Design a protein with these regions (language model features):
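DNA-contacting surface of Y-family translesion DNA polymerases
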Residues: 1-111
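Acidic, metal-coordinating catalytic segment for phosphate/diphosphate chemistry
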Residues: 86-172
């Protein structure tokens, strides 16, 4: 029927909300130091949390993954990932980075030359539907802080305001 121009499936009128948000990169050079990997993961968390805030979403969990090159056999291949659930769904960059870095400490193995790392925020839901019994004035202050950071970065360029854990030089 579609070949005759008769649609079989109706088109969605509105785009459906995303269910996850991934930010990952391959590094320009192999990374061996934990601090450089930590900066990269923190930076990816900041980008991912900014993306979900722009869509008015919150995440229930963050997954961190790292890997070495499968083609450099002399160094051995290593790949690992871990997920941590948030007690309350969030889009707070500070909370996301803190949890992601705690996971990174578990999966990092010294002596490997990492080629790629990334973060995935999962279980995304509408921020409006995220009210709970434990919401407080502190949460509202953090939300205002995140909006201020996002507005400043939008106005003056990405990463104008950032967390110290994301590094300054970004040599990776």
């Amino acid at each position: 029927r579609e070949l005759r121009g008769v649609p079989c499936i109706d088109l969605e009128k509105t785009a459906s909300k995303r269910k996850s948000c991934v930010v990952s990169r391959s590094f320009g050079k192999r990374i061996e130091k934990f601090q450089e990997l930590e900066e990269a993961v923190a930076s990816y968390c900041l980008n991912a949390s900014e993306k979900i805030r722009s869509e008015n979403l919150v995440a229930k969990a963050v997954m961190v993954f790292v890997r070495t090159s499968p083609f450099q056999k002399q160094f051995g291949f290593y790949s690992n990932s871990r997920t941590v659930d948030f007690p309350i769904a969030t889009n707070n960059s500070i909370e996301i980075v803190k949890n992601a870095l705690s996971v990174l400490k578990v999966i990092f193995r010294k002596g490997h030359r990492y080629q790629k790392a990334g973060v995935m925020l999962t279980g995304l839901t509408d921020a409006e539907n995220n009210e709970n019994l434990f919401s407080s004035a502190k949460d509202e202050r953090i939300n205002r802080l995140m909006r201020s950071i996002d507005n400043t970065n939008y106005r003056y360029g990405r990463s104008t305001l950032s967390l110290a854990s994301a590094g300054v030089r970004k040599s990776w």
